[in-house]
Every structure is written in C-alpha cells, then in structure tokens.
C-alpha cells in the first residue's frame, strides 16, 4: 500500500471519472476520496461502481463554493485523512504507469525536510484528436503531492496552486491532463475562466507557483498587445510553428483567443466600475 490519499474534485464528470479512478488503482493508495459538487449526470453512479470495485474509494458531496481552491481547502479541512501524503487530481487527469511506479518507489525515500513533490503535466487535447501539445506547454511543472498538514490552497479564484513552506523535489515522469469535452464545450468553459481570471486580476490577487514572476510581467504590458506577444512567444520562440496544424490551432485558441477575451473581460469590468 502506498502511503498517500488522493483527493479528486468532480462536477458532472461522467466522461472522465472512471478513467481517472481506474488509472489510480495501480497506485494502491491508502485512500481515494472523490469530492463532488452536486453532479447531475452519471458521475455519482460511476463513483459508487468504483467503490464496489476497488473498496478504497470514498464519496463526499459538498456544495460548490465558487472555485477549485476553496473546494480543495474544504477537503483538506474536513476529510479524515490518515496517510502521510496527499495527492490532488482533477477528474480529467490521470497518472501514467511510469509515474505510478516512480511514486511507489520514491515516496518512502523522500527526506524528512521535503514537504512537497512537483509533478510534470502533459496536456492532451481531446477536441484536437487527442493531440499531445508539446512545444510551448510541456512540461508544466506543478506541485500536486505534499505531506499531510504541510500543504494548503492559495485560495485564488483562478489558476490555483498548492503552497508548502518546506523544500520540494521533482519527479521524472508525467501525469496527463486529457479532457474529452468538445470544442464548443471548451470555448464555453474558457469564457467562464476568462471572467474569473479578470476578477482575480482586478481584485489584486498575486500569482503563486513557478509562473508567478512571468504572469506579473505579462500583466504590466498593455491590454490586447500582451495577448499577441504571448501568442508570438508560444508560436515562434517556443516552437509551436514546428509542431504542425494541431499545435497551430491550439496555440491560436488557447494562446491568443483566450488571453484576448480575458483582456476584454478586464476592460468590461473596468468600464462597469467607472459607471457605478
């Protein structure tokens, strides 16, 4: 048994949750806890099927507090966790077999002064025929594994991170972010993200994680111009242009369109404030 509790946040994830839990089975975690925010599809039924199948899976329903950071912090504060380590996952994410093996071998060997483990995220885009977008995005390093009692959510509205005070180490292998939603669903989801990111920016929230300095520099640039600069860096300097049509399309939508609508939402919010 691996001395880790996996916390998975879900909400209408019938397309993803079975894959996530099936991949976790090989980890042999002490606990797998799914926190649902009132799913209205088959998510809950699928989870209970996996409870019967694997035994270690637990289900908790908690009303959506408005953002992922607050939901995860609720889980940390209220769940009965007995393991020494905690791993945080979304339903559309899963561990590669290589990462499972690495965690099982390395986790017992981590020094006592290490509080967190940084994982490498591989981004696979379902609406681009399951393309793995590498240049300009891989690897994204993110702290997802930490000692019980040593990690906390940064409580940001958008792009939340786990914060630890002690040392961190990095693993060699990947976990995969592979959403199966359609292109239209992706756009609708990112319009919502744009509103939250604009709200986060205007409220003065400071970024955390390894991208904090880059994000601070980005927001010092003029609106809209910075979106073009961001796209240009991803497309030309980081080599997306060399990866083919799928990478071009992803870079356009995620690297330019999304950043553009964030700036549009910031402008709309500023104008609304000035009129009130």
Placement of each model-derived feature along the sequence:
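Acidic helix N-cap motif at the loop->helix transition within catalytic regions
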Residues: 18, 41-50, 98
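Short, conserved active-site loop motifs that form the nucleotide-linked donor/cofactor pocket
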Residues: 30, 56-58, 114
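Catalytic-site signature of metal-activated, phosphate-bearing donor transferases
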Residues: 69-73, 87, 97-271
């Amino acid at each position: 048994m691996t001395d880790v509790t996996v916390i998975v946040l879900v909400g209408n994830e019938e397309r993803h949750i079975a894959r996530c839990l099936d991949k976790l089975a090989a980890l042999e975690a002490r606990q797998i806890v799914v926190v649902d925010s009132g799913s209205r599809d088959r998510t809950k039924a699928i989870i209970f099927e996996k409870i019967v199948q694997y035994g270690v899976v637990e289900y908790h329903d908690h009303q959506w507090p408005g953002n992922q950071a607050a939901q995860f912090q609720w889980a940390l504060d209220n769940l009965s966790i007995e393991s020494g380590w905690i791993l945080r996952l979304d339903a559309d994410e899963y561990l590669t077999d290589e990462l499972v093996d690495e965690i099982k071998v390395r986790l017992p060997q981590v020094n006592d002064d290490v509080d967190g483990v940084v994982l490498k995220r591989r981004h696979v885009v379902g609406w681009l025929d399951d393309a793995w977008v590498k240049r300009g995005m891989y690897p994204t390093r993110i702290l997802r594994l930490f000692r019980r009692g040593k990690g906390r959510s940064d409580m940001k509205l958008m792009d939340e991170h786990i914060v630890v005070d002690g040392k961190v180490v990095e693993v060699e292998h990947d976990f995969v972010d592979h959403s199966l939603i359609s292109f239209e669903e992706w756009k609708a989801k990112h319009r919502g993200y744009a509103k939250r990111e604009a709200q986060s920016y205007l409220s003065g929230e400071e970024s955390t994680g390894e991208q904090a300095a880059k994000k601070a520099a980005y927001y010092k640039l003029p609106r809209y111009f910075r979106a073009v600069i961001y796209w240009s860096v991803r497309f030309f300097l980081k080599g997306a242009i060399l990866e083919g049509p799928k990478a071009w399309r992803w870079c356009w939508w995620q690297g330019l369109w999304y950043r553009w609508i964030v700036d549009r939402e910031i402008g709309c919010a500023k104008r609304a404030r000035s009129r009130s």
